[in-house]
Design a protein with these regions (language model features):
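Early extracytoplasmic/lumenal segment of secretory-pathway proteins
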Residues: 18-86, 213
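A structural signal for short loop-to-beta-strand junctions that line the ligand-binding cleft
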Residues: 72-76, 94-133, 159-161
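Ligand-binding "clamshell"
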Residues: 88-95, 112, 117-121, 232-244, ...
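Short beta-strand->loop
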Residues: 94-105, 123, 238-250, 259-262
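Short loop->beta-strand "edge-of-pocket" segments that line small-molecule binding or catalytic clefts
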Residues: 150-164, 177
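Ligand-binding pocket segment of bilobal, Venus flytrap-like solute-binding proteins
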Residues: 161-165, 169, 173, 181-245
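Mature extracytoplasmic/periplasmic domains
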Residues: 259-320
Length: 389
C-alpha cells in the first residue's frame, strides 16, 4: 500500500513538473503588464497552460553561485555572454533542441554563433546592449560626463554610485587604464583594483538594482549602468542623461539557456520560443528598453525606441566598445580576491576611523567632565573657606 501511495505521489509530482517551469532572470528584465504593457508571463501561461515560477537575480555572479550551490531547480536562465561561456565550459547547460524553438529563425545572423557559444548549441539571444554613464544634468556637466573619471570626481563626493559586481567595476577601471576588459595579467588586475580603491572615498554606495530608486529620486547624481535601464529611468526623471565614455565601454549580449538539472526541458524550450516570436519580442523589449536581436521585431516597435541613439548606437560609437569573454580560473579568482579587498579594506578603514574618533570623543568628554567636576569642587571649597572667614 505504501509503495502504491509513493508511486502515485511520484507520478503526480512528475505531471506537475511538466505543467510548470521556473525562470531565473535579471530584475526588471521582462514586460510585466505595467503601464498597459504586455504581461509576457501571463500571455505565455494562457497560450500554453504552463505555469511560470519567476525568480530574479542582480548579477551574473550571484546567479552562478545559486546554480553551483543548488537548492532550486531552474528551467530557464538568462546570463550574459561571458557567463554563458563559463557555464558551457563547466558543463552546466543542456543543449537546446531547436526543433522546439522554430522562432529562432528570426534571430539575426549577426547575433548567432557568437564567441561565447560558437555553435549556438546552448543559447538563444534575448537582448543586447551597452554600459554607459547615467548622470543628472542638474548637478553634473555634460563635459564631465564624457569620461569615467567623473565617478572619481571629488566635486560629486557622496552622490556617486558604482557597480556592485567585480566584472563590471573592473571594466571601468580597465577602460581608464587602457587595458582590455579580458586581461588576465595579474599586475594589470592589481592596478585596476588600486584605482577602484581610490574611488571609494567619494562613493555613496555600491549598487545594482537599487540604482533605479537612487537616480530617479535624485539621491545620487551619477552611476554606470545599462543603456536599456537608463531608458526606463529617464521616464521617471527627465533630468537624467546618458553618455558613452570616451575611454570605452562594455557591449554585451544576454541569452536564454537551459541549465543542467532542469525539471521541464520541453516547457523551457516552449518559453524560449515564445520570447523569440517577433510580436512578443517587440512588446517585451519596447517595455524594458533593451535592444532586440531580431530585425523582424522592430516592425512592431515604437519608432522612438528603434531610432534611439542610446538603444541602437551608431556603428562609429560601438567601435569604442568591447565584449566580455570568459576569464580563466586563476584570473577570475584574482579579480574576486582583489574586489573583496577593495570593498572590505575600505570598510575596515572606515570602521577603524569611526572607532578611533569615538574613542577620542570619549577621552575628550572624560577630561571635560573631570575638569568641570574639579572646578565645582574648587568652587565649593572656596565657598566654605569664605564662610569660615
Amino acid at each position: 500500500m505504501k509503495k502504491r501511495i509513493l508511486s502515485v505521489l511520484l507520478l503526480t509530482t512528475a505531471l506537475a513538473a511538466q505543467n510548470e517551469i521556473t525562470v531565473y532572470n535579471w530584475g526588471q528584465y521582462i514586460s510585466d503588464g505595467t503601464d498597459d504593457s504586455m504581461d509576457v508571463i501571463k500571455e505565455f501561461e494562457a497560450e500554453t497552460g504552463i505555469k511560470v515560477n519567476y525568480l530574479t537575480f542582480d548579477s551574473n555572479e550571484s546567479m552562478y553561485t545559486k546554480l553551483k550551490t543548488g537548492g532550486t531547480s531552474y528551467d530557464v536562465i538568462i546570463p550574459s555572454d561571458y557567463m554563458v561561456a563559463k557555464l558551457i565550459s563547466e558543463d552546466m547547460l543542456e543543449p537546446i533542441d531547436f526543433s522546439n524553438v522554430p522562432n529562432f529563425e528570426y534571430i539575426d545572423e549577426t547575433f548567432r554563433n557568437q564567441s561565447y557559444d560558437p555553435e549556438n548549441k546552448y543559447s538563444v539571444p534575448y537582448t543586447w546592449g551597452t554600459v554607459g554613464l547615467i548622470y543628472n544634468t542638474k548637478y553634473i556637466s555634460e563635459e564631465d560626463a564624457q569620461s569615467w573619471s567623473c565617478l572619481w570626481n571629488s566635486k560629486y563626493a557622496g552622490k556617486l554610485l558604482m557597480f556592485d559586481n567585480p566584472r563590471d567595476a573592473f571594466a571601468i577601471a580597465e577602460s581608464m587604464l587602457g587595458y582590455s576588459y579580458n586581461t588576465e595579467d595579474a599586475q594589470e588586475l592589481k592596478n585596476a583594483a588600486d584605482l577602484l580603491a581610490t574611488q571609494k572615498p567619494v562613493l555613496q554606495a555600491y549598487v545594482m538594482d537599487q540604482i533605479f530608486d537612487k537616480l530617479e529620486r535624485g539621491e545620487a547624481w551619477a552611476a554606470p549602468y545599462y543603456a536599456g535601464d537608463y531608458l526606463t529611468m529617464v521616464e521617471e526623471n527627465p533630468d537624467l542623461a546618458f553618455s558613452f565614455p570616451e575611454e570605452g565601454f562594455n557591449f554585451f549580449s544576454d541569452a536564454m539557456c537551459i541549465p543542467k538539472g532542469c525539471q521541464n526541458k520541453e516547457g523551457a524550450e516552449a518559453f524560449i520560443n515564445f520570447l523569440c516570436r517577433p510580436d512578443v519580442s517587440a512588446a517585451n523589449l519596447d517595455y524594458i528598453g533593451y535592444s532586440t536581436p531580431e530585425t523582424a521585431a522592430k516592425e512592431y516597435m515604437d519608432e522612438e525606441v528603434t531610432s534611439s541613439p542610446v538603444a541602437y548606437p551608431d556603428p562609429s560609437v560601438l567601435e569604442r566598445s568591447e565584449a566580455f569573454e570568459e576569464l580563466g580560473i586563476e584570473a577570475t579568482q584574482t579579480m574576486n580576491d582583489l574586489w573583496l579587498s577593495v570593498k572590505t579594506e575600505g570598510a575596515n578603514t572606515t570602521l577603524y576611523l569611526t572607532l578611533t574618533l569615538a574613542a577620542i570623543a570619549a577621552v575628550v568628554a572624560f577630561f571635560l567632565i573631570s575638569a568641570a567636576v574639579t572646578r565645582r569642587r574648587k568652587a565649593k571649597r572656596c565657598r566654605k573657606w569664605r564662610e569660615a572667614e
